[in-house]
Amino acid sequence: MLAIMVRFYQSQSEKSAHNTKKIYSDNHQLLISFINSKALQTMAKTIRPSYYDDDDISSEDDFTYSSKTNKKSRGDEEDDELSSISFGALNRAQAKLSKRDSDDDEEEEEEEESADDGFFEDSDSDGPPEESSSSNRHGNNDKKKKNKHAPSESSSKRPVSRIRDIPGLPSRREQTLHTDIRFDAAYGKADLRKIRKDYAFLDDYRKQEISNMEGILRDKKNRLNDDEREEIKLQLQSLKSRMDTLKNRDLEESILKNYKKQQMDDFKSGKVNKPYFLKRSDKRKVLQKAKFDSMKPKQREKAMERKRKKRLGKEFKQLEFRPNNR
């Protein structure tokens, strides 16, 4: 009875050892095939197709010979490697192989679907095939990217103003930035008499500025170049002409005011039945007579010379364009 039990246990142990060896051999074969496939993929990436030469044929023979020798040596070493590989490593290798096979199948299906779609889309149109989404994304980014030396762009939706700002010239905003609302036309016509009365003190500053400029021009110690001297002369002439204009305007106002006052006094005293208000032509004559009376002899001669030249110019124009009746 004891001998029968010993034989039974020996047979069971032999069966279990045979099963474990079979599992080891199957898993080892899977691992070997996985390693060989990876090696072939890397070699396929590095080896490129070309024309067949003698050197290529010899290299292919060497490659096949080396692969055969490797297979033989691996077959001899399989039994030794089975004992060193664990179940965990074999399970991980098997999971990776199954995952890789499923990924390859999905990629092949996607490639077939994209090829079918491209075929049907290209058959309808004569143009080039459409680019992928990634290429479209890159193309959009290239379009959005601008060169810093590119000309400036403006929106076509906004209407163009009639008066445009020219680079290098003062813009309209700068000109109208600091405007005095007291002289704005939107508030009505300005009262020159009141303005002149309120800002009469500015004449003192203008006179002081004229005297300073004349002193700068007379002083020989000031090392002024020709451009600076010419600019000061122009400013001095502008100030003098402005002062003369203001004086003439004040004189006209005083003459008309005095004439009006005299007429009202005569009317109140009974010398005249009705006051006489001057017409525009009469005003001009009265102002001209008063100006000549207030002028110095040299100024009067210059004014007479200007009037004579002006009158001669008008006469020459009339003679030049007179029609010939002969």
Curated annotation (Swiss-Prot):
Keyword set includes Oxidoreductase: no
TM segment ranges: none
Region (Disordered) location: 51-178, 288-326
Keyword Nucleus: yes
Regions annotated as coiled coil: 207-250
Compositional bias ranges of the Basic and acidic residues kind: 290-304
Record localization: Nucleus, Nucleolus
A Pfam family reported for this protein in Swiss-Prot or TrEMBL: RRP36
Biased composition, class Acidic residues, residue ranges: 52-63, 103-129
Protein's GO biological process: maturation of SSU-rRNA from tricistronic rRNA transcript (SSU-rRNA, 5.8S rRNA, LSU-rRNA)
GO cellular component: 90S preribosome; nucleolus; small-subunit processome
Keyword set, alphabetical order: Coiled coil, Nucleus, Ribonucleoprotein, Ribosome biogenesis, rRNA processing
Principal subcellular localization: nucleus
Subunit structure: Associates with 90S and pre-40S pre-ribosomal particles.
Sequence similarity: Belongs to the RRP36 family.
Role: Component of the 90S pre-ribosome involved in the maturation of rRNAs. Required for early cleavages of the pre-RNAs in the 40S ribosomal subunit maturation pathway.
PANTHER family: RIBOSOMAL RNA PROCESSING PROTEIN 36 HOMOLOG
Protein name in UniProt: rRNA biogenesis protein RRP36
Organism: Candida tropicalis (strain ATCC MYA-3404 / T1)
Highest classification ranks of the organism: Eukaryota, Fungi, Dikarya, Ascomycota, Saccharomycotina
